[in-house]
């Protein structure tokens, strides 16, 4: 666990805020070995600030990985990301362009998220991002505790992740916030 975390962004549904429809962007990090979603949140903007919030959340709750693997999107491939990796001691890998198979686990999670949850949402179901994120967190909790057919003994992502909890490298909240 915490060897590689894959990160990516997907389009979420439209939600209506103050009478206007807004596209939601969902950023997720997934642990390669356990399939645990270490962090996931929806935003109205797909940018580095949003990505940083997700990374800090993941490290706060699950420790730090040895490697982040991202696609080549602008918010992932930035000088700020290089500096972040150096500050916290995490290597950063960028997948070759137009090769979704190089980050297949996060892409598969997004497909599951869309087929099981996002497809049910209508634009008028949500009127603020906080409520949407609350429900998204509930879905992630369910996902992380559901047995996964590709894991040993059909373990859940959480069970697989915490089976090796002794190797989690935690960071102080102060260091996370300074990153």
Model-derived segments and spans:
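Mobile-element integrase/transposase regions
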Residues: 1-28, 36-37, 48-57, 61-66, ...
């Amino acid at each position: 666990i915490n060897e590689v975390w894959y990160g990516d962004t997907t389009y979420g549904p439209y939600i209506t805020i103050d009478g206007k429809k807004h596209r939601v962007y969902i950023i997720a990090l997934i642990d390669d070995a356990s399939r645990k979603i270490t962090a996931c949140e929806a935003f109205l903007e797909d940018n580095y600030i949003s990505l940083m919030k997700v990374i800090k959340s993941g490290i706060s709750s699950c420790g730090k990985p040895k490697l982040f693997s991202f696609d080549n999107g602008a918010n992932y491939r930035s000088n700020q990301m290089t500096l972040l990796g150096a500050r916290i001691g995490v290597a950063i890998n960028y997948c070759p362009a137009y090769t979704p198979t190089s980050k297949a686990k996060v892409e598969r999670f997004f497909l599951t998220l869309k087929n099981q949850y996002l497809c049910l949402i209508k634009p008028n179901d949500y009127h603020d991002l906080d409520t949407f994120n609350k429900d998204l967190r509930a879905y992630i909790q369910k996902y992380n505790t559901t047995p996964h057919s590709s894991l040993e003994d059909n373990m859940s992502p959480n069970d697989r992740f915490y089976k090796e909890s002794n190797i989690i490298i935690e960071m102080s909240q102060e260091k996370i916030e300074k990153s």
